[in-house]
A protein has these predicted regions:
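Flexible C-terminal active-site loop/helix
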Residues: 337-424
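Catalytic core of soluble alpha/beta enzymes
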Residues: 192-345
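Short glycine/serine- and small hydrophobic-enriched flexible loop segments
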Residues: 132, 136, 323-327, 349
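Glycine-rich phosphate/pyrophosphate-binding beta-alpha loops
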Residues: 14, 19-21, 48-56, 165-171
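Active-site-facing alpha/beta catalytic cores
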Residues: 106-248, 261-268
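Metal- or metallocofactor-binding catalytic centers and their adjacent structured scaffolds
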Residues: 37, 42-138
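Short, Gly/Pro- and small/polar-rich lid/capping loops
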Residues: 1-35
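Glycine-rich beta-alpha junction loops
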Residues: 38, 49-51, 312, 338-341, ...
Length: 424
């Protein structure tokens, strides 16, 4: 099945407020819609561009618009590179495209040390379109049929409930926080690593966490083994040394918060190769994971969980990383990457098939689109089969029955409303 042509469209989704994390903030979400055509079928994939998350150096060197345009050009490069080829599978295509896209992006951004996450993020829309073509070619109609044999053991769970983790950014509405905490099913993913020097960051993080713990720390939680609310802290690589992180942990211990920490995600810059197995909390890897070798290296350094991002680093790479973590007995979880409804199903399908983390009675999925996008309701309505359909009435959980596990959560359908820009 040879790819004969491609098309690309860009959509800019407005946010309710700036999304602040990793020492910066962005004000709108850019999405690429990628169309790949063969003689037999058409695949349309959406990719959400995450410049600040994937490489802050690009974000800092350009305007918000400029950084997004650079990543969109990498997506265009990858789609064009596929024309005239006949990849055996999406995974084979991504394996070939990733080094090419990374080299192109390094030259484009003039950053020799550009993080591979930038290139992976640019490939998401291309990969999603490839999976639609793959399904059409082989007559596949469910997500279970998409899972390659090598990843089936890693994705053998069948969660019927996922706790939805909203991202609590620096500017999150405290009134909304209180409402969520009262639900009894609240697991906040708190963005730490405030802007400023390391000392300023630490002081602001300590103050903010003290405030949050006083506000919601006693809230009940029906998802944890001991009934207490748990916290998920995400530093996005802002802590430059183990000493600074230990000072934060000492503060959390003093205020009685430490034993309610489920995990801390990506505390150090990805070039930091420190051992973390001696820390008193579970440490998860995220941005520093680009392939299975990175998964194995982080596990060797004591990282206790691997964060997967089907909608941030491609489904193809997610399958490979999930299998690598499972082979070494290390749990995995799924994070959101600011998904619009049309992208949510890609993450939801993976999260629903991972075992629960230690201390949890069900699965989890970070999903912050509801709090982030101005037009969330309209976007969810437009793509009626998307993952947002499974949100509970109070929006704290995804309720997943047998019908969900027998389907695909909309990922094999044209991603409305974005398909209109490339389907003519």
């Amino acid at each position: 099945m040879t790819i004969q042509s491609c098309d690309l469209d860009i959509v800019r989704e407005p946010l309710l407020r700036p999304f602040a994390f990793k020492g910066g903030a962005f004000t709108e979400k850019w999405l690429t819609a990628v169309c790949l055509r063969t003689a037999e079928a058409t695949g349309i994939g959406v990719g959400g561009l995450a410049i600040l998350w994937s490489d802050p150096a690009v974000f800092g060197a350009h305007t918000e618009t400029g950084g997004n345009l650079l990543m969109a050009l990498v997506t265009e490069f990858a789609a064009q590179a596929l024309v005239g080829t006949s990849p055996a599978s999406p995974m084979e295509a991504v394996q070939t495209l990733l080094p090419q896209a990374h080299e192109y992006a390094r030259n484009l951004t003039r950053l020799p040390e550009l993080r591979r996450t930038f290139a992976l993020n640019a490939l998401v829309g291309v990969d999603n379109a490839l999976w639609q073509l793959h399904a059409a070619r082989h007559g596949l109609t469910t997500f279970n049929q998409l899972v390659p044999d090598f990843a089936k053991d890693a994705l053998c769970a069948r969660q019927h409930r996922l706790v939805r983790l909203p991202a609590i950014t620096y500017s999150f509405d405290d009134a909304r926080l209180a409402v969520l905490a009262e639900s009894g099913c609240f697991l906040p993913k708190i963005k730490i690593g405030h802007p400023g020097t390391q000392e300023e960051m630490l002081a602001r993080d300590c103050a903010r966490l003290t405030e949050l713990h006083a506000q919601v720390g006693c809230a009940p939680a029906d998802y944890s083994d001991d009934g207490r609310l748990l916290y998920y802290l995400d530093a996005n690589g802002r802590y430059e040394s183990g000493d600074t992180l230990r000072r934060l942990l000492d503060h959390l211990d003093r205020i009685g918060m430490l034993d309610q920490i489920l995990l801390i995600e990506e505390p150090f810059p990805e070039e930091n190769q420190s051992e973390v197995g001696d820390l008193p909390v579970m440490i998860a890897a995220d941005e520093s994971l680009h392939d299975v070798d990175d998964v194995r290296r982080r596990i060797g350094q004591g990282y206790g969980a691997m964060t997967l991002k089907a909608a941030g680093k491609t489904l193809s790479m997610t399958f490979a990383m999930a299998a690598a973590a499972h082979a070494r007995g290390v749990p995995a979880l799924v994070a959101d990457s600011g998904c619009v409804p049309a992208l949510l199903g890609w993450n939801l399908n993976v999260a629903a098939r991972l075992p629960s983390l230690p201390g949890m009675s069900c699965g989890i999925l970070e999903s912050n689109g509801l709090e982030s996008y101005r037009n969330w309701a309209e976007l969810a309505h437009a793509h009626a089969t998307c993952g947002a359909h499974f949100l509970s009435r109070d929006t704290t959980t995804f309720e997943l029955g047998d019908a969900f596990h027998a389907g695909h959560a909309g990922i094999l359908d044209p991603p409305k409303p974005y398909a209109a820009g490339v389907s003519a």
